């Protein structure tokens, strides 16, 4: 394995690896199939600028070196982290893989992170704000990093996740970075249920977003609920759109004007009668 890494390490960053990986893992499942390995190595060597005359020979060498220590699962799937280790330094590897190790399953937690790092409430994460996020991320994982490297990795993350190349990240970009799981509300069919079923579903929904268990949604709990509600009808939303809809929801639902949405207030908004 070391011999496979020597000529490539330092020649490729996480963004370069990601460009090749995406050709094969379009749906971002985190793995490719064993039958795709030859083509993957071929594209990777092309990215590294290896001469065509020796490319095919090197593909077979790399495949042998990779397969020797790896026990490919019975379903023939090869995880991204197994291949990334061949080409990337430890830190570059971390940038690519931390999102797979700790995916977020809560829009409430996601919005807490969004509000923290969108420090100027612009509705976007700037490069400087992303840099702060990465600094905290490395500290959390007890990894020492210089400011110069931090700036370099911020640029790498922008290359990977800034889809429209405008130099800033929107809600959807950060959701991809944090590997936010499927919208919690997708499992409910509110319009196709009886009154009792709707009440039962409402209880589950409110309990999910009332993370603090106070009987009211506030702060990122409101944000998380708004985000998931909006994405039921508009899959790609911006931070500024979320803020507008949040204001509308509070205007309609926050009857006592305390800046929170009580359980009874949300039920009333949704046309439900619940037991006090």
UniProtKB/Swiss-Prot annotation:
Residues at which Ca(2+) 4 binds: 210, 212, 214, 221
Superkingdom assignment: Eukaryota
One matching Pfam family: EF-hand_7
Binding sites annotated in the UniProt record for Ca(2+) 2: 118, 120, 122, 129
Compartments where found: Cytoplasm; Secreted; Cytoplasmic vesicle, Secretory vesicle membrane
InterPro entries in alphabetical order: Calbindin_Ca-bind, EF-hand-dom_pair, EF_Hand_1_Ca_BS, EF_hand_dom, EFh_SCGN
GO terms assigned for molecular function: calcium ion binding
Record-annotated disulphide pairs: none
Binding residue positions for Ca(2+) 3: 162, 164, 166, 168, 173
Protein name: Secretagogin
Organism expressing this protein natively: Bos taurus (Bovine)
Gene designation per UniProt: SCGN
